Amino acid sequence: MVPSLALVPGEPAGIGPELCIRLAQQPRSDAHLIVYADPDTLHSAAKALCLSVRLLDPDQPARLPGDLPLHPIRQAAPTRFGTPDPANAAAVIAGLLGAAGDCLSGKLQGIVTGPVHKAVINAGGIAYTGTTELLAAQAGCPVVMMLANSIVRVALVTTHLPLRAVPEAITAEALARCLRITATAMQRDFGLEHPRIAVLGLNPHAGEDGLLGREELDVIIPVLDQLRSEGMQLIGPLPADTAFLPQKLTDFDAVVAMYHDQGLPVLKYSGFEQAVNITLGLPYPRVAVDHGTALELAGRGVADPSSLLAATALCARLAARS
């Protein structure tokens, strides 16, 4: 039996709805997709693309190009592509929490999410820092953000923090939690019995024996030593400027970076179109596109669906394993 997955477009004025319409043009055999969105927005996106869409009841199978099972989420205001309306912030959050709630109840087996506009959600009166944080709070469990493409997987100890706040956030507890969640996910979700995880240092040259900072000596190395004694295969701390050399990437299954812009530029350079965002640690698979709302492209029919296609395929595989 194929898994049932929620598909949440995200910001209705962005490219999320039209990417869902494109996805619906190719019926899948690996998953039953149910889109959590406003039906009028989906019809408008289909019209803008000159493509057909037939919205079905959630339990109806998609058999023909354009078939799209729908869990309706009504917006407060009509969609104008390229122009977000904070009045629709509640609908965006309702779609995310509704889909995730159905995963927690066992009704669905995974969730694929499109891009959300943080500023618009907050302008709508809802405190929101990101979908990863939202779903973690709902599930009540610690999570790790991992971005991946066909070349490399990168997990983050810290995510959306100002750079000046990062050193203080790199605690022994935070690092150990990130490494344990990453290792467990590599085993459970990716089938790697003994995952090899590279760990980057925080400072240039991984601190150079304390000359360029003491975080490696005081925090990172003691944590790695402790977890190695528990059986984890950890490499590092490695200098970030050489860790991603092609000949080194074959030596490990995932990389743990200390902060957002330390690990992600290389991943995005090596294959941005196919990159996806995976939330490790949730009780269900959640995979997201690795791009923004692209308001300037919305409704024009030129948005690249590669990341959504990759996210959906990966979520289906992860859900089938769980």
Swiss-Prot record:
Principal location listed in the UniProt entry: cytoplasm
Cofactor dependence: Zn(2+); Mg(2+); Co(2+)
GO biological process: pyridoxal phosphate biosynthetic process; pyridoxine biosynthetic process
UniProt EC number: 1.1.1.262
Gene Ontology CC terms, in alphabetical order: cytoplasm
UniProt catalytic activity: 4-(phosphooxy)-L-threonine + NAD(+) = 3-amino-2-oxopropyl phosphate + CO2 + NADH
Keyword Transmembrane helix: no
InterPro entries: PdxA, PdxA_fam
Enzyme class: oxidoreductase
Presence of the UniProt keyword Magnesium in the record: yes
Location of the protein in the cell: Cytoplasm
UniProt: a divalent metal cation binding residues: 160, 205, 260
GO MF entry, a single one: magnesium ion binding
Record keywords: Cobalt, Cytoplasm, Magnesium, Metal-binding, NAD, NADP, Oxidoreductase, Pyridoxine biosynthesis, Zinc
Pfam family, one: PdxA
Annotated positions binding substrate: 132, 268, 277, 286
Cofactor binding note from Swiss-Prot or TrEMBL: Binds 1 divalent metal cation per subunit. Can use ions such as Zn(2+), Mg(2+) or Co(2+).
Functional pathway: Cofactor biosynthesis; pyridoxine 5'-phosphate biosynthesis; pyridoxine 5'-phosphate from D-erythrose 4-phosphate: step 4/5
Complexes and interactors: Homodimer.
Misc. comment: The active site is located at the dimer interface.
PANTHER family in alphabetical order: 4-HYDROXYTHREONINE-4-PHOSPHATE DEHYDROGENASE (PTHR30004:SF5)
Family: Belongs to the PdxA family.
Free-text function comment from the UniProt entry: Catalyzes the NAD(P)-dependent oxidation of 4-(phosphooxy)-L-threonine (HTP) into 2-amino-3-oxo-4-(phosphooxy)butyric acid which spontaneously decarboxylates to form 3-amino-2-oxopropyl phosphate (AHAP).
Protein known as: 4-hydroxythreonine-4-phosphate dehydrogenase
Organism: Xanthomonas campestris pv. campestris (strain B100)
